[in-house]
């Protein structure tokens, strides 16, 4: 509360605080964005304030330590170091980071990692499909669990799966029925958690049809973890995502600290979710408020505490680890370290987990993304991609109002996941075309066509679901930062769903080249949007769709 009181004291507080940050443009921009947000929200009576996110900056949870020298703040990427004031910073060698290029590669890697897992398998997704490929994945899990029991020295293998309740319960055959044999056969080793948004309750829950109740809010995090290795992606566990639905994937191999963090994060969300039982019923964790039957405010407060405890404790651990590493390096020469057998390569890549759970008043990803867009200077290039082009007003204003060059990749109607669907849902691609045309018109009216360019992805027989961004600093032909994970940069991602992605910051040229090639391969399958694009027959939007889109755009 002291933070909010200090912020309310007025501009003098901010001048003094920003004066303490020479040479920290990122953090200064972050505080500036938050100051603007407080001004907009000050008159709203809200139980919790996003200003609480500033607490780690003003009242650190751990003692202040001397910042390491340039080994942790390399030239050119040091400007992103401010992110660690909000989330844990994980320094790794770029040799442990691999960008995957195709759905098939991701699927085969996932199965291979499950087969050799000894300690833990943690999988968070929107849903698990019901086809033969999804069954193959379940069979892999079952086989690995069986082997763990039959081994000469039985392992402590644990499997934790987190899905969305509404999406995972749709239809008679669904994610729950696919997974049910696992908790039935291995009740001591398997946990299946189903997150239910606290905003779908009461009469609303009774009236909204099954296919549409997902619009209120979802568990949208996609993390696939095997022992100490992690796949971060935007892809769900469904056949199209294993074959012909284009997404992004990064494999973090033997990164124990990152694996520990995401295990704890999934456990935290699992604790505030419903637990699947062997008889296909669900139960609340003992002592937890029910997500849609209990008091919503109390539930959200408990969920906020559970998740923020994970983030803050990991941040504290990493700060202490950085301090110890810095102290040890100052005492030991490289020869001493080699003689002692420490052959670990120095970190040249930094991973920052960015969490967005607005229902729980956690908006770290939003703050970091807005600050990155704010700081992108003249000459910098931002490649931003989303499968569902529906930017929030804040992101749109930053794209149109800052100086960096933007190339925005989005799905053409034919590769939109809803293309050809029956009923009202089939009009969703047209709604996205309408939103795209409105944005393009605004770009043109501002004379920004050279600086902000739209491109549409098209690939015969495929759909498009990739999201994220690549940041190229001014004068550089390779990206030094990428965001990869579940957020789509739209209203849902920011306000309704549970999201997670990572910021990868690297000074390693080989990894930068991997990221650059990933970006190029996606954009090579696209065409530049012009006024002629919207004259095509496939871009004609019916009047009723134009009228309805402003009313429903916040739900997709």
Swiss-Prot record:
The modification Phosphoserine is found at residue 49. It catalyses: a CDP-1,2-diacyl-sn-glycerol + sn-glycerol 3-phosphate = a 1,2-diacyl-sn-glycero-3-phospho-(1'-sn-glycero-3'-phosphate) + CMP + H(+). The keyword Phosphoprotein applies. Residues 1-28 form a transit peptide. It is an enzyme of class 2 (transferase). GO terms for cellular component: mitochondrion. Activated by calcium and magnesium and inhibited by other bivalent cations. GO terms for molecular function: ATP binding; CDP-diacylglycerol-glycerol-3-phosphate 3-phosphatidyltransferase activity. SUPFAM superfamilies: Phospholipase D/nuclease. ATP binds at residues 124-131. One of its GO terms (biological process) is cardiolipin biosynthetic process. Pathway: Phospholipid metabolism; phosphatidylglycerol biosynthesis; phosphatidylglycerol from CDP-diacylglycerol: step 1/2. Keywords: ATP-binding, Lipid biosynthesis, Lipid metabolism, Mitochondrion, Nucleotide-binding, Phospholipid biosynthesis, Phospholipid metabolism, Phosphoprotein, Repeat, Transferase, Transit peptide. InterPro entries: PGS1, PLipase_D/transphosphatidylase. The active site is at 220, 222, 227. Its EC number is 2.7.8.5. Residues 215-241, 460-493 form the PLD phosphodiesterase domain. CDD domains: PLDc_PGS1_euk_1, PLDc_PGS1_euk_2. It is found in: Mitochondrion. Belongs to the CDP-alcohol phosphatidyltransferase class-II family. Functions in the biosynthesis of the anionic phospholipids phosphatidylglycerol and cardiolipin. This is CDP-diacylglycerol--glycerol-3-phosphate 3-phosphatidyltransferase, mitochondrial.
């Amino acid at each position: 509360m002291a933070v909010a009181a200090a912020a309310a004291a007025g501009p003098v507080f901010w001048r003094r605080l920003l004066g303490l940050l020479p040479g920290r443009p990122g953090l200064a921009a972050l505080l500036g964005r938050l100051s603007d947000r407080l001004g907009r929200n000050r008159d709203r009576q809200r139980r919790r304030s996003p200003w609480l996110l500033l607490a780690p900056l003003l009242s650190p949870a751990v003692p202040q330590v001397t910042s390491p020298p340039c080994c942790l703040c390399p030239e050119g990427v040091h400007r992103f170091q401010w992110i660690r004031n909000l989330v844990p910073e994980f320094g790794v060698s770029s040799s442990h980071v691999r960008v995957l290029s195709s759905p098939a590669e991701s699927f085969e890697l996932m199965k291979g990692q499950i087969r050799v897992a000894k300690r833990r398998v943690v999988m968070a997704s929107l849903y698990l499909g019901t086809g033969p490929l999804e069954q193959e994945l379940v069979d892999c899990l079952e086989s690995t669990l069986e082997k763990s029991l039959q081994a000469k020295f039985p392992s402590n293998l644990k499997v934790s799966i987190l899905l969305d309740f509404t999406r995972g319960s749709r239809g008679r055959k669904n994610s729950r029925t696919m997974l049910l044999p696992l908790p039935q056969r291995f009740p001591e080793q398997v946990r299946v958690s189903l997150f239910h948004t606290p905003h779908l309750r009461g009469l609303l829950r009774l009236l909204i049809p099954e296919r549409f109740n997902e619009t209120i809010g979802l568990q949208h995090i996609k993390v696939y973890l095997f022992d100490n290795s992690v796949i971060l992606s935007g892809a769900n566990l469904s056949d199209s995502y294993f074959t012909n639905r284009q997404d992004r994937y990064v494999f973090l191999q033997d990164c124990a600290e990152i694996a520990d963090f995401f295990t704890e994060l999934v456990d935290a969300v699992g604790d505030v979710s419903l637990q699947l039982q062997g008889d296909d019923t669900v139960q609340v964790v003992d002592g937890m408020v029910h997500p849609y039957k209990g008091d919503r405010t109390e539930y959200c407060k408990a969920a906020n505490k559970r998740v923020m405890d994970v983030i803050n404790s990991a941040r504290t651990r990493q700060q202490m680890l950085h301090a110890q590493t810095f102290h040890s390096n100052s005492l030991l020469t490289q020869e001493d370290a080699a003689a002692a057998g420490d052959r670990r390569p120095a970190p040249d890549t930094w991973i920052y987990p960015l969490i967005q759970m607005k229902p729980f008043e956690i908006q770290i990803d939003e703050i970091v993304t807005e600050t990155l867009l704010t700081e992108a200077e003249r000459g910098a290039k931002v490649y931003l991609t989303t499968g569902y082009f529906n930017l929030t007003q804040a992101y749109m204003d930053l794209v149109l109002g800052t100086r960096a060059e933007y190339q925005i990749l989005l799905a053409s109607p034919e590769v939109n996941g809803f293309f050809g669907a029956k009923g009202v849902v089939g009009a969703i691609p047209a709604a996205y075309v309408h939103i795209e045309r409105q944005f393009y018109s605004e770009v043109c009216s501002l004379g920004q066509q050279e600086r902000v360019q739209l491109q549409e992805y098209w690939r015969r027989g495929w759909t498009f679901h990739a999201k994220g961004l690549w940041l190229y600093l001014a004068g550089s032909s390779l990206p030094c930062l990428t965001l990869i994970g579940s957020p789509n940069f739209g209203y849902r991602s920011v306000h309704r769903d549970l999201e997670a992605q990572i910021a990868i910051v690297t000074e390693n040229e080989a990894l930068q080249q991997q990221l650059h090639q990933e970006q190029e391969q996606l954009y090579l399958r696209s065409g530049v949007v012009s006024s002629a694009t919207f004259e095509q027959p496939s871009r004609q939007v019916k009047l009723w769709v134009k009228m309805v889109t402003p009313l429903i755009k916040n739900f997709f």
